[in-house]
């Protein structure tokens, strides 16, 4: 008698947590794109899967995944640093590196114009590849005419991620029965907005913890001097921390769109600066979405409805002769607290 194995898949752009600080610093030195945190373009898995226990076969997949690669969500994420550089250029206080940076950001802005936060072609391809890997690795789940039930948040990049993945699954097996939906009706668990927990993320204690870390670990003056020739202009006109974070976001997002083939902004930064900014991003995510004491330690419970849904739908599907798969397409801001809630 064969036993059944349930697979719970939580997919995100996360790197192994056991990686030591020094080894990861070396990896960033070798490949700057790894510093991009949640903007890291989803890397194609290359490891070998752990085989199921003897006598077990996979019969059901329950999945919550982030959308694929996207453009930055807001126009000001491009315009805010660009306008600062343009103002400096207009009065002649930019270095040659600063002038190069203006030209690059203008190209990025043009590529993303009116596509703020939308899925890129790379993002669509990522979900097609995920579908192919799932089908190849778990044929017992997707055999014959089983049901695949898919839900997305109402955000277009998530909907298109879902559609690209489902279309590829159907290409692999035209007999699959697929149903999909993206509705405000399901947002209570697909992307819960808990006002009380949201306020706890923005307390003075959280802000002070972030500011204290920044003061101890960050020094952006050398970077600023590579872009501007006049320190008084910088002091009077620039919020240096925000400006550098904007540049770091732009540098990280490049790898997610087609413009990655023709430009990079990582030449602005030293490897040590990239490592420090990567660390800062980790601190920010921990303070806002994990069980940090500064936020009351309750942020993982923002995904309580999603976890309940995963459990109840698994119970329901496993009562069927052929359970199939339940696929959910959402955001990284759900995945981190969900992972913490699952311990």
Spans of features found by a protein language model:
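Signature for phosphate-centric chemistry
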Residues: 22-147, 153-325, 330-343
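Bacterial Sec-dependent N-terminal signal peptides
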Residues: 1-24
């Amino acid at each position: 008698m064969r036993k059944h194995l349930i697979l719970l898949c939580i997919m995100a752009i996360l790197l192994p947590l056991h990686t030591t600080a020094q080894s990861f610093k070396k990896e960033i030195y070798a490949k700057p794109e790894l510093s991009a945190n949640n903007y890291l373009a989803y890397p194609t898995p290359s490891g070998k899967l752990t085989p199921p226990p003897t006598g077990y076969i996979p019969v059901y997949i329950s999945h919550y995944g982030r959308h694929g690669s996207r453009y930055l969500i807001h126009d000001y994420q491009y315009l805010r640093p660009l306008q600062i550089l343009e103002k400096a250029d207009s009065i002649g206080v930019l270095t040659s590196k600063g002038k190069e940076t203006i030209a690059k950001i203008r190209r990025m802005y043009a590529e993303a114009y009116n596509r703020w936060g939308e899925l890129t072609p790379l993002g669509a391809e990522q979900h097609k590849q995920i579908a192919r890997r799932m089908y190849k690795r778990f044929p017992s789940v997707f055999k014959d005419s089983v049901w695949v039930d898919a839900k997305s948040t109402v955000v277009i990049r998530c909907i298109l991620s879902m559609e690209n993945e489902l279309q590829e699954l159907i290409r692999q097996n035209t007999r699959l029965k697929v149903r999909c939906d993206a509705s405000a009706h399901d947002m209570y668990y697909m992307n819960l907005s808990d006002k009380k927990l949201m306020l706890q993320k923005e307390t003075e204690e959280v802000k002070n913890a972030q500011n204290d870390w920044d003061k101890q670990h960050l020094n952006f003056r050398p970077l600023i001097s590579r872009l501007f020739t006049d320190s008084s202009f910088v002091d009077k006109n620039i919020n240096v921390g925000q400006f550098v974070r904007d540049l770091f976001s732009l540098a990280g997002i490049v790898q997610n769109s087609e413009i990655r083939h023709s430009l990079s902004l990582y030449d602005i930064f030293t490897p040590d600066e990239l490592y420090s900014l990567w660390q800062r991003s980790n601190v920010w995510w921990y303070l806002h979405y994990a069980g940090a004491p500064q936020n009351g330690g309750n942020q993982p419970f923002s995904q309580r409805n999603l976890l309940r849904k995963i459990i109840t739908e698994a119970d329901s599907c496993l009562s069927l002769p052929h359970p199939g798969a339940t696929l959910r397409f959402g955001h990284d801001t759900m995945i981190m607290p969900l992972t913490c809630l699952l311990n």
